Amino acid sequence: MKTLVIAEKPSVARDIARVLGCSKKENGALEGNKYIVTWALGHLVTLKDPEDYDKKYKEWNMAVLPMMPEKLQIKVIPQTGKQYHAVTTQLARKDVNEIVIATDAGREGELVARWILDKAHNQKPCKRLWISSVTDKAIREGFANLKDAKEYDNLYRAAVSRAEADWLVGINATRALTCKYNAQLSCGRVQTPTLAMIAQREQEIREFVPKPYYTVTAAAGGVVYTWKDEKSGGTRISDPEKAKQIAEKAKRYPLVLQNVEKKKKQKEAPLLYDLTELQRDASARFGYSAKQTLNLMQSLYETHKVLTYPRTDSRYLTKDIVPTLKERLDAVSIGPYKALAQQAKRSPLNGKLFFVNDAKVSDHHAIIPTEQYVQLSALSNEERRIYDLVVRRFLAVLLPPCVYEETVIRASIEKECFTARGKRMVEKGWQEAYEDNRYDEEDEAKEEVREQNLPLLEAGMKIGQPKISLREGKTKPPARFTEGTLLSAMENPVRYMENRDSSLVKTIGEAGGLGTVATRADIIEKLFRSFLLEKKGNEIYLTSKARQLLKLVPADLKKPELTASWEMQLNDIAKGKKRRDVFMKEIRSYTVELIDEIKTEEGTFRHDNLTNKKCPNCGKRLLAVNGKNAKLLVCQDRECGYRETVSRTTNARCPVCHKRMEMIGKGEDATFVCACGHKERMTKFQERRKKEGGGVTKRDVAAYLKKQKKEAEEPVNNAFAAALKGIKL
C-alpha cells in the first residue's frame, strides 16, 4: 500500500518527491515504492459563482440582491481542471490507503488541500505535514513527525468561513455598487479600508497649513548647543519675539557647562525579518514593490531553497530551530559573509537568545537562511539584494550587542538651557554586519538635538562668547504613502480607527491589522490594477475613481475595525473558541443590512476621464487610465472588456535630462518620449546605445514587453472578475 502526498505547487512536490525517492513520472504525479507525490496549482477548487446556483444571477440586477444561497458550494476551477483530475485519479487508486496534506502550513494552505479532498469525497485517513522550509532536512524531519489532519479541522473551518464571508459580502456589495451607479466598482473588507487610509492621508496633506518655528543654537569650542525648553523638552519656539529675545540674550553672556553625563549603553540588533518588514526595507532601499519583494522571496524559497518560508508574520524563532543555527551559519559562510559568520559562531547559540520565543511564533518563524549552501552567482541581482538583507539581519542578531558611550551636556546661558549630545562607539558588535550602517529601524532624522563628536569637556567649564544662530523653519505636511509605509499602516491601522476602544485596539493588534502578511502585496497590486491607485515616482495617489468610490461605499466597509473583528473571530474559530455556524449567521445578517444601505444611498458616479476615442468593439467612448507601469485606454462598458496600451514606462534614460522615458507604439514604430520633449525612434535609440556601449537588442525589448504584459492582459472590465478581485483577501 502507498501514501499519497498532496503539495501546493509543482516545485515543492518535486522537492518532496526527491527526498521520498519518487522518480517515476505519472500523469500529474511522481511515484516511488512507498509514496506518490501529486500537487495542486494553488487553488484547484473554489466557491461556485452566483449563476451556478440560479440562472437569474447571470444578469447583474439590483432586484435579486442580496444573493444568499442556503449553502455555499464548491466547484472545480476550469482552468486547472486537468490537474484536479490528475489528483483525484491518484486519490481513487486502490493501493493508496493514506493521504498526507503537504500544502503550505497556514490557513489558506489548509483550504487548498481540504477543498480538493472534500470535492473528491475522500474517506481515506489523512496526516498533515507542517514545515517552514523545503530543504531536504526539513522535509525528512517533517515526515518523521506527521500530525493527524484532524488536529487542523478548526483551521479548515476558519479558512472556509473566511472564503464564504468574503463571497457573501464582497460579491453582493460589488454587484450592488456596480448596478446602482453603472460603473465597475468593487469593494472588500481589506481593500476599501486601505483606500480610506490613503484618502485620510491625502486630506491631511490638503488641509495642512505650514507653521513657522524658530531654533536657537550656540556654537562654542567645536560643539553646537541647541536651546531647549526645560518644561516641555522641545527645541522649537513658535513665538518669533521670544526666539529673538533668547538669541539676543545669549549673545551677551558666556556659556557655562552645568552637567556632563556619560553613560555606557548597549543595543541589540533589530529583530529578524517577517515578510512585511522585509517588504518595507526593500521598498525604502531599492524601490521594490511589495509584490516584487514577495515574488523574489518566493523564488529564493522555492527555486533556490536558500531562505525559509516567506509568508510569515513572526520576527522570532522557536527553540527547536536553535540547534540548526550552526548549520545555517555554515551555509552562509561564503564571500562577503564568511568573516561575519565565523564571528557569529563564537557567540553562544542557545535558547536564551533574545530573538527566540515560542510564544511569539504562530504558524511560521521569522525569515532566515536555510541549511542549503548558496551559490551567489546563481541568483539574479534582485534576488541577491533580498538574500543580502536577510543574511545580514540573521548574522546581526547572532553577533554581540553594539556598545557605545552616550554623552549629554547640559549648559546654560544666563538661565537659558542649552544641550548637546554625542555618541562614541565602544564595540561595533552587530553593526559590523551592515557595511552602509543602514541598520536602525527608528527614524533618527526626528531627533531634534543632533548627535555629534564631542571633545573632552567637564562640568563648570565656562566658554566665552559663543556664536549664536537664530534659524527659521516651517512645519512639513505628512508624507504621502509609499508601498513600504502603506504596508506599515495596513499592519497597524490604529491611527485610522474612529473608535479607539482598548478592546478594539487589542483586537486589531492580535489580528495583525488589515489583511494578512500573505495577502497585503496582492491587495495593493489589485488596487493599482483596478485603477484606484496610481504612482508618481514612489508616492501613491488616489485616482478620481477611488475618491468617488469612497463616497458611495457604506461607512462600515471603510473602517479597519470591521476586518479586525472578522480576523479575531476567524482566529477564535481556528482555536475552537467560536462555532463556525454562529459566525456565518452573523455574516448573512450583516450582508442583508449592507445591501439595503447601498440600495437606499443617494449618490452619483461620473467618469471624468472619458476620451473622444470610441471603442472598436462596442462604439462607446474609451476611458483614459494610468496603470502602475503604463497608460491605457479601456472601455467604460464592464461587459465589453476592450483595452489598449497607449504608452509604457521604461528604464531607458533620456540623453538630455536623464529621466525615465515612456515608450509609445509597437515594433519598429516604437518611439521613446521624455517629459522634457526629447523623442527617439527605436532604431535611433538602439544605435545610440550601441555607441555608448549599452546596446539594446530586439530580444531585450521583447523581454521587457513580456515582463509587463501581465498588466495589459488583466481583465479590468469583466464585472465578475472585478468582483473576485475585490474579495480575494
Question: Model-derived features: where do they sit?
Answer:
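Glycine-centered, phosphate/nucleic-acid-interacting loop/turn motifs that mediate DNA/RNA or nucleotide
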Residues: H304-K305, F531
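Metal- or metallocofactor-binding catalytic centers and their adjacent structured scaffolds
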Residues: I237-L271
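Conserved short loop/turn motifs at secondary-structure junctions
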Residues: M1-K2, A102-A105, N182-S186, K262-L271, ...
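Basic, low-complexity terminal or inter-domain segments flanking catalytic cores
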Residues: K2-L4, T80, L91, T174, ...
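Intrinsically disordered, low-complexity regulatory segments
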Residues: M1-A163, E230-K231, P477
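C-terminal or mid-to-C-terminal helical accessory/interaction module adjacent to the motor/catalytic core
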Residues: R114, A138-A220, K262-K263
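Structured, non-catalytic alpha/beta "coupling" segments that mediate domain-domain communication
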Residues: N27-K55, T192-S238, V397-R450, S589
